[in-house]
Amino acid sequence: MAMQKIFAREILDSRGNPTVEVDLHTAKGRFRAAVPSGASTGIYEALELRDGDKSRYLGKGVLKAVEHINKTLGPALLEKKLSVVDQEKVDKFMIELDGTENKSKFGANAILGVSLAVCKAGAAEKGVPLYRHIADLAGNPELILPVPAFNVINGGSHAGNKLAMQEFMILPVGASSFREAMRIGAEVYHHLKGVIKAKYGKDATNVGDEGGFAPNILENNEALELLKTAIQAAGYPDKVVIGMDVAASEFYRNGKYDLDFKSPDDPARHISGEKLGELYKNFIKNYPVVSIEDPFDQDDWATWTSFLSGVNIQIVGDDLTVTNPKRIAQAVEKKACNCLLLKVNQIGSVTESIQACKLAQSNGWGVMVSHRSGETEDTFIADLVVGLCTGQIKTGAPCRSERLAKYNQLMRIEEALGDKAVFAGRKFRNPKAK
């Protein structure tokens, strides 16, 4: 089924920054997709095209990307008469038309916007739900509901507190269904709010970009202690484990790490990667930490490798791998991590996202699907995680509508699957294992 019309516009994301939205029309109707955007971005990500016109949106406008779709990509696709079911052909055509390594001609935000809309239209054309269409594109016969990783305490570049590490997450792995995982997550979240309010005052329960709390604490183990207390208070010590996203590239300074990077710089307090690794090992020993993302800088390969060989938990590459097949292959070869963080806008098309996921899985890695800190009401990644059977998703706290949009969509998908719904639970690292 051919595309009839492609139209892009500039909308605002959850942080009040412009982003790209695409409407694609076929005989089956209108299919709309919006592109997310990150705050802590890896230097190897595909290029997000911004206008740079300081008189509009502080230079963050996306009218150039929108124009690339409306004047170039859209007309070229309509002329080519590709079917919306042929995701790979459509994506390949756009990537070749762009012709750059990192999509800098049109912008990954332009190409991805069209790619996502095409995927939604393709599902409608086949008359199947989006998650089933994605599963077909990936060659997956089964469908799996993921364990949600709720980012409930925020630090790093996402928050105005002193906390260096960016995300402290709870994973209800002991739940029996996705819906139950949502309830457990929400209950722990509310208990956490009470614990923080009692200890630090009401203003400490204001929420960050992803709906988590950002109390003004400096010590990272204090955040873990708060989680432990809230999990106990909610009555789920046997069902909830902890994940972290350190985003260490944000505080890497001349070969060392600064755990107080939001204060005036003082090289005397910078620590080595090895020392930081010891700190993580203490966290693993003292708390139910099962997953650590970006524990070291995106180019500090040697430290990643030596750390991975000394722990048996999930070590996730995000800034390290940026959903890019070349970086993933490098990380596999160096044995740097054992899980990929999958962000569609880091690579810039649905096809390449699926390829990155399959490359990681074929090397025995786990895969965690992820939102960005600047999100929209678009729910594509909810269907994506079910279709790709990755078993885990992080899309913020159970708070703020742009986060709940994804979680609520996952509850609907579970409901639609009925008896056939399979929840990853404790097998979140390798949900396909029988």
From Swiss-Prot:
GO molecular function, a single term: phosphopyruvate hydratase activity
Keyword Metal-binding among UniProt keywords: yes
PROSITE patterns, sorted: ENOLASE
Binding annotation for substrate: 158, 167, 293, 318, 370-373, 394
Disulfide bonds: none
Residues recorded with modification Phosphoserine: 83, 157, 176, 263
Summary of the function given for this chain in its UniProt record: Glycolytic enzyme that catalyzes the conversion of 2-phosphoglycerate to phosphoenolpyruvate. Appears to have a function in striated muscle development and regeneration.
Protein name (database record): Beta-enolase
